[in-house]
């Protein structure tokens, strides 16, 4: 099973009986999570940060009406982009706005949004950024599968997993598998507390 801890960045963690080194894995640690198993870790350096950058820098004033409706700007954008079909806008993006951790491990790479026109709307750009991060996740999943480290189930924790059903559905569609999101609001803090309690 793969765990995606989704927040400002996304950390991918899973355990496997065997150590299989392959491109795109940031670390493999024996007994790193559970004694007797190899703990694998990969990641994307900017996921929630990309969405926040977009909301802070790219939205025209009329989209700030979300505050008048009592919701965050990103929740408002989720609502708008949830009404769009996949590929409807023709926009394509690469999620390298803070470089690439997995699988290329090159922090000098930069993000791209292609297909923009004078008719491109903010919600279309926002959806292209969500899709870009989801395809980045797909590339990570594919590297595990191609190396023989199978992924049977997918779990998601962190702020994005709880706050954005639209993002989670886009990820599930692009990964072509269901995702189970935790209902715990601060799962990382809870996990740290459990580890401290049993140490």
What are these regions (language model features)?
Residues 1-199:
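Active-site core segments that coordinate phosphate-bearing ligands/cofactors
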């Amino acid at each position: 099973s793969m765990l995606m801890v989704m927040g400002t960045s996304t950390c991918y963690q899973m355990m496997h009986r065997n150590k299989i080194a392959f491109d795109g894995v940031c670390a493999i640690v024996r007994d790193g999570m559970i004694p007797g198993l190899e703990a694998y870790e990969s990641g994307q350096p900017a996921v929630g940060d990309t969405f926040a950058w977009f909301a802070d820098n790219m939205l025209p004033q009329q989209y700030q009406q979300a505050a008048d409706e009592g919701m965050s700007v990103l929740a408002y954008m989720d609502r708008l982009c949830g009404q769009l079909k996949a590929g409807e806008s023709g926009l394509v993006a690469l999620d390298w706005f803070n470089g690439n951790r997995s699988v290329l491990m090159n922090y000098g790479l930069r993000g791209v949004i292609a297909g923009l026109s004078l008719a491109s709307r903010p919600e279309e750009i926002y959806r292209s950024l969500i899709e870009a991060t989801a395809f980045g996740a797909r590339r990570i999943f594919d590297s595990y599968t191609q190396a023989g480290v199978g992924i049977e189930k997918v779990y998601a924790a962190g702020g994005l997993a709880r706050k954005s059903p639209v993002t989670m559905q886009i990820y599930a569609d692009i990964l072509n598998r269901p995702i189970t999101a935790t209902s715990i609001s601060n799962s990382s803090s809870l996990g740290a507390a459990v580890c401290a309690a049993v140490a």
